[in-house]
């Protein structure tokens, strides 16, 4: 049985008739292969998947509501929130984290590139997981008959798993960085990591031994509120994200979130200045940290915008 190659090399009838002639030449028909376009691999197109956007859209209303209660009327948490929070500085600190969360998840809805928001998901998982753990550790401190308590409990039991799931799934679409993309310098990366180490270390102390931390904390805290503040500080693990992805485009969103949080914390410290014990070093350290985030973040955002402009437009 003739193979396909035999058919491609078979001579024409005219050639076959003259195959005995020495002058006859066999002409072979070329085997032309058409090029087939290979579709782009969808798993590396850097898009934000629908489940990720849906989760972001579902979380935003809860964060907005929590922010309005805790920041606008922090003295009414006993009647409006999952548990009465005192003093108001703690309520406003948690509200500042919610404000940063709103900014982050709105960015998730708006962006078309997964890598620009990817590093923000692990901190959310840690934050929500720690608040869920604090809820069960201090179950008796909550107002069980209030709808806000059940919303709080459901949110912080479910959210860590949902956020972790969408992050793991959406990571499959991550595209590699282009060679010419602007990146952070070595010293800037070290500053990010150092800030993360300080924030997370203090957060871990508050989560593990809140009673001990209360002796040095700038305002009055309980075991529950100490662990809540610790969860907020553990959002600092976002600083470690530069070890995985140090592109400006991957970092700028996290810087914006940090600046939003720092702005509201600074205002809260002014509003609750009578609650803060300014003779404690951590009070001034917190003020310095907030200032560093606002100033350093502003400088970095300016550099990022400059790097995005064409060379001829830079000054």
List each model region and its residues.
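Surface-exposed interaction/gating patches
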Residues: 49-68, 174-246
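Hydrophobic, ordered structural segments
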Residues: 100-175, 264, 268-271, 278-307
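Core segments of alpha-helical transmembrane spans in multipass integral membrane proteins
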Residues: 89-106, 126, 224-244, 260
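Juxtamembrane "helix-exit" motif on the non-cytosolic side of transmembrane helices
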Residues: 72-78, 136-143, 207-214, 270-276
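Transmembrane alpha-helical segments of multi-pass membrane proteins
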Residues: 59, 121-130, 185-198, 255-264
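Membrane-interfacial, low-structure loops and terminal tails that flank and connect transmembrane helices
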Residues: 32-47, 171-187, 312-315
